[in-house]
Amino acid sequence: MQSLIAAIVALVVVAIIAIVVWSIVFIEYRKILRQRKIDRLIDRIRERAEDSGNESEGDQEELSALVEMGHDAPWDIDDL
């Protein structure tokens, strides 16, 4: 009887550990996807700036909304 209880407790512990690990994996995956989206927007802004001579305001607004910062160009740091 005690071995049955121990087996059930072990299964519960393993299930909790699996949920925690997969939650961490999911959070990190979302971070990676978000960073890829930011990188694509930065590349698009750079590409348009090279083509037209000025930067695209729409892409900068989208990037600043995505990054949730007041700084429009995170790669242009002059306030050190």
Swiss-Prot record:
Region feature Disordered, mapped onto this chain: 49-80
Post-translational modification (record): Phosphorylated by host CK2. This phosphorylation is necessary for interaction with human BTRC and degradation of CD4.
Residues with Phosphoserine modification: S52, S56
SUPFAM superfamilies hit by this protein: HIV-1 VPU cytoplasmic domain
Subcellular location: Host membrane
Gene3D superfamilies: HIV-1 VPU cytoplasmic domain (1.10.195.10)
InterPro entries named among the record's database cross-references: Vpu, Vpu_cyt_dom_sf
Keywords on record: AIDS, Apoptosis, Host membrane, Host-virus interaction, Inhibition of host innate immune response by virus, Inhibition of host tetherin by virus, Ion channel, Ion transport, Membrane, Phosphoprotein, Transmembrane, Transmembrane helix, Transport, Viral immunoevasion
Membrane side Cytoplasmic: residue ranges: 28-80
TM helices/strands, residue ranges: 7-27
Biased composition (Acidic residues): 52-62
Protein topology in the membrane: Single-pass type I membrane protein
GO terms under cellular component: host cell membrane; membrane
Single GO term (MF): monoatomic cation channel activity
Documented activity regulation: Ion channel activity is inhibited by hexamethylene amiloride in vitro.
Extracellular compartment residues: 1-6
Similarity comment: Belongs to the HIV-1 VPU protein family.
Domain notes: The N-terminus and transmembrane domains are required for self-oligomerization and proper virion budding, whereas the cytoplasmic domain is required for CD4 degradation. The cytoplasmic domain is composed of 2 amphipathic alpha helix that form a U-shape.
Additional remarks: HIV-1 lineages are divided in three main groups, M (for Major), O (for Outlier), and N (for New, or Non-M, Non-O). The vast majority of strains found worldwide belong to the group M. Group O seems to be endemic to and largely confined to Cameroon and neighboring countries in West Central Africa, where these viruses represent a small minority of HIV-1 strains. The group N is represented by a limited number of isolates from Cameroonian persons. The group M is further subdivided in 9 clades or subtypes (A to D, F to H, J and K).
Summary of the function given for this chain in its UniProt record: Enhances virion budding by targeting host CD4 and Tetherin/BST2 to proteasome degradation. Degradation of CD4 prevents any unwanted premature interactions between viral Env and its host receptor CD4 in the endoplasmic reticulum. Degradation of antiretroviral protein Tetherin/BST2 is important for virion budding, as BST2 tethers new viral particles to the host cell membrane. Mechanistically, Vpu bridges either CD4 or BST2 to BTRC, a substrate recognition subunit of the Skp1/Cullin/F-box protein E3 ubiquitin ligase, induces their ubiquitination and subsequent proteasomal degradation.
Name of protein: Protein Vpu
